């Protein structure tokens, strides 16, 4: 949609977005600190997530990385846009290939004063993101998380195409966050 509208969504850091802004600074050769970047792509209201729609308790949802929340929402939208209904894909050989890289939310949770809960493992683990999609949508094909830094989404798409060509799955959902 952004490409179609020609919109630029890169902007300055929103107030209160970083608990410790020092992580955004780098040391110069002279020993002074400079902000590595003044801009970023930030999703407004990233904490707004209809957990109950996906059968997730509010307690568990608090520990789910926004990347996983968005993958669920966008995955659902992609299936709807493709005209797929639950009966068509539930228990199907659908593969999920997800490109993920950062652990910012996990670092944020671990920096909180109270002890994290068990849900941190499933909510912030990059390896569990594709499994969450497969489980939620009832897919029974390959479920692969990909971490190749900046190329993760592209590699996820490549692996999805490869899996389709090899008949390892009948349909594939490729995503990246």
Predicted regions and their residues:
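Cys-dependent condensing catalytic cores that perform Claisen condensation/acyl-transfer
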Residues: 1-177
